[in-house]
């Protein structure tokens, strides 16, 4: 039940973009088309989950073991950058078609603060490895959900006549705010589930 709570909370209640405001750059920059947002979401899900596993292991068995906790941020950035490069090389060799589809998104993931944020959050929350994997994957799903829904909103906005003063970034920010308000409706769901299943 604890894992279900982590899953629901990471996707809806504490959405990485709409509640914690991490990953705003791809949220605004890659959300013009649903196709590109789905590609970015898939790439982020893969890298975020893999990076969280590796950074958790590095934190637990290297940084904590040798008293090097102060190197956490630098170590995590190096791990994420290395993983992205490794994934890019493997995809290029194994599946050129998938590499072509995701190739433009992979370099962007290195600078996506959501990936680093999740790696640090699992350490701060003192999650074990399995909890960390569930949290990272759930957060990636929440990232993809927010990105794809927002891309759908932006595609619909292209079809309507928007007043001149509201065009461009103004309507984008207003739409992002409305989407964030919609996700606020999920606040309290995790608390309700804890009470319902006696986990509080």
Regions found by a protein language model. Name each.
Residues 2, 182-200:
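Juxtamembrane boundary at the C-terminal end of a transmembrane helix
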Residues 3-18, 67-82, 134-146:
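Structural signature of hydrophobic alpha-helical transmembrane segments
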Residues 6, 13, 44, 49, ...:
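Hydrophobic core segments of alpha-helical transmembrane domains in multi-pass membrane transport
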Residues 21-29, 88-94, 103-106, 113-126:
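Generic transmembrane alpha-helix signature in multi-pass membrane proteins
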Residues 22-36, 84-98, 150-161:
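C-terminal ends of transmembrane helices
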Residues 35-46, 70-76, 98-109, 165-170:
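Cytoplasmic-side transmembrane-helix entry/capping segments in multi-pass membrane proteins
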Residues 60-103:
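Ordered, amphipathic secondary-structure segments that act as subunit-interaction surfaces
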Residues 155-173:
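Interfacial loop-to-transmembrane junctions
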């Amino acid at each position: 039940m604890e894992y279900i709570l982590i899953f629901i909370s990471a996707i809806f209640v504490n959405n990485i973009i709409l509640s914690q405001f991490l990953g705003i750059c791809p949220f605004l920059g890659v959300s013009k088309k649903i196709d590109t947002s789905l590609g970015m979401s898939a790439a982020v899900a893969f890298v975020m989950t893999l990076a969280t596993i590796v950074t958790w292991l590095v934190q637990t068995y290297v940084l904590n073991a040798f008293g090097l906790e102060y190197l956490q941020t630098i170590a995590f950035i190096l791990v994420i950058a290395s993983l992205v490069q490794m994934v890019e090389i493997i995809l290029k060799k194994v599946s050129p078609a998938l590499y072509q589809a995701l190739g433009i998104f992979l370099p962007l993931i290195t600078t996506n603060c959501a990936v680093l944020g999740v790696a640090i959050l699992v350490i701060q929350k003192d999650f074990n490895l399995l909890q960390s994997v569930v949290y990272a994957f759930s957060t990636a799903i929440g990232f993809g959900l927010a990105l794809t829904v927002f891309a759908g909103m932006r595609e619909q906005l292209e079809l309507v006549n928007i007043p001149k003063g509201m065009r461009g970034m103004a309507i984008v920010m207003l739409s992002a705010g409305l989407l964030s308000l919609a996700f606020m409706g999920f606040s309290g769901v995790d608390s309700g589930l804890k009470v319902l299943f006696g986990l509080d």
